Amino acid sequence: MLGHNQNVVYQVNTFYNEKVQQRKARVTKNVHRIAKVVQEILKEVEAQEPRFINTLTETSTGRFDGIVVHSPSEYEAVLYLNQMGVFNFVDDGTIQGCAVLKLSDGRKRSMSLWVEFITASGYLSARKIRHRFQNIVAQVLQTPQFSEYCKLLQDNTDVRVRVDDKYTVQITCAFRCNGIWPRSASHWPLAGLPWPNTALANQTKAEGFDLTSRETAITQHNNPNKQASTMEADAWAMKMHGAENMLLTGGRQKTLSILKCLRDAHMDFPGTPVTNYILKTLVLYECEKHCSEYEWEDTNIGDRLVGVLLQLVSCLQCRRCAHYFLPSLDLLRAKPTHTIEHSAKLTWHLVRKLMIDPNALQTL
């Protein structure tokens, strides 16, 4: 697979035009089904609790703002909440990948739309809002309108719904933070690298991030430090999908799309720690190693695929994968050792075939 010749270009384009496009078409169809169901659920939720307003919208291109695709069978719908203004955003690095929303000095609790979810210390609790939202969704899904094809998964406190017994969608409450950049990511972009250029870096920072209410590695497992666990449960997890997507265009996005296809076919199993998000993270790191545009042209995409997969093998062997913007956050944290070891074997088998078989993409 390694090398720069017309055979590589042909294989890359054939794989992309056939398997990647087939995957995209299937995902697009699934997204429309998921979005329709989520909008119906949120309509009923809003009727019971007007503060949870449906923010899922379809664009002129047929895409849905607020839907994140984790795999062809796993999705996330982001519900953006209103009125964060009376809170200060505090990102001091105390809780990895998270920040807290603290009532501004001089502000009264009664000035907030979310008054009953504010802790005694003045923090807006992500856990309390999530608990309230989950209870309402549970009530909605028990009605005849939804009970035949929707089921609330209650294996944790996230609001996860099984649809048609085929798809899982997590509905996540979040605050949108445009135009600000988290302190935990202040090191980015790294000095001295030509990628991204100044204009792209500034656009990426202006995109901002989301503060989401979700379970994290600490709250999902028994933590001996109860106070730390409670603090993290009340904190909001930072998600930076918009900023990441701004950096991945052209050949970079094409590389990621091919990797997603390869993951679905060769690295997916129940409980796999290798998510599409980890692949996206490693592509971003690969961008820093290969800054020039020509390095992401079709003739070089074979090398980029191998490079990312070798990074993945290394991460799995070290049992650590640092978040691209928030390096203190380990994306493999708390993942079972046996699943990491199995993923390492599957990934190495895949990358070995890509390296030694000049026609690998034709058979994968």
UniProtKB/Swiss-Prot annotation:
Key words of the record: Developmental protein, Differentiation
Name used for this protein in its record: Protein male abnormal 21
Organism annotation: Caenorhabditis briggsae
RNA-binding recorded as keyword: no
Pfam families assigned: Mab-21 (PF03281), Mab-21_C (PF20266)
Main function: Acts in a cell autonomous fashion to specify the properties of the sensory ray and non-autonomously in the choice of hypodermal versus neuroblast cell fate.
Signal peptide (residue range): none
InterPro entries, sorted: Mab-21-like_nuc_Trfase (IPR046903), Mab-21_HhH/H2TH-like (IPR046906), MAB21L/cGLR (IPR024810)
Top-level taxon of origin: Eukaryota
Family, as annotated: Belongs to the mab-21 family.
DNA repair as UniProt keyword: no
GO biological process, one term: embryo development ending in birth or egg hatching
